[in-house]
Regions:
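Short amphipathic alpha helix immediately N-terminal
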Residues: 101-119
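Major-groove recognition helix of helix-turn-helix-like DNA-binding domains
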Residues: 134-148
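Helix-turn-helix DNA-binding module
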Residues: 117-136
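Preference for long, well-ordered alpha-helical segments
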Residues: 108, 125-126, 140, 144
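N-terminal interaction/assembly modules
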Residues: 1-98, 152-157
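The DNA-recognition helices of helix-turn-helix-type DNA-binding domains
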Residues: 116-117, 130-131, 145-146, 153
Length: 157
């Protein structure tokens, strides 16, 4: 169960980070477009007359405008995502600490492969040496027990 929670939390973190990056880029595009060197005042038509608005007010309007899909402005959503990313990182640290304390070859294999980033072969060799068993036994009896979890992680990456 803890392995599945780790995987799901890690994927949720990656999703939040991707969304945060996307929104940061959108905010940057608005900034360059309306406050950049090449963007002086913008002409806007209002009440049948042409009148200009400075770029700062347009930029602030765009980042402060509430998105109908999310119900938040761009700045509010960025702030919320930053908070969620920090929270998920804290949760992942706790899960990693708990996984490292667990006994059992399957958990040791999982930690070596997923958290430490070792290849399956390196992890099997390390676990076999640490626990004084043959590599063949690890390949045959212990690795198949976590293979499904490892495949799920590879598919979701």
């Amino acid at each position: 169960m803890i392995v599945r929670n780790y995987t799901n939390t890690l994927l949720e973190l990656r999703t939040c980070e991707a969304r945060y990056k996307l929104l940061q880029e959108r905010r940057e595009v608005y900034y360059v477009k309306y406050l950049g060197v090449r963007s002086p005042n913008i002409e806007k038509i209002g009440s049948g007359k042409n009148w200009s608005i400075d770029g700062m007010s347009v930029f602030l309007d765009l980042v402060g405008r509430v998105n109908e899909q999310t119900g938040m402005s761009l700045d509010d959503e960025l702030e919320l995502l930053a908070h969620q990313i920090a929270e998920l990182n804290t949760v992942l640290k706790r899960i990693r600490a708990a996984l490292r304390k667990m006994e059992g070859l399957e958990f040791q294999l999982y930690v070596a492969i997923v958290i430490d980033g070792k290849t399956v072969t390196e992890a099997v060799q390390e676990i076999a040496e640490k626990n004084y068993i043959s590599e063949q036994a690890v390949w045959r009896y212990h690795l198949p027990k976590i293979r499904e979890e490892l495949e799920a992680i590879r598919r979701k990456k």
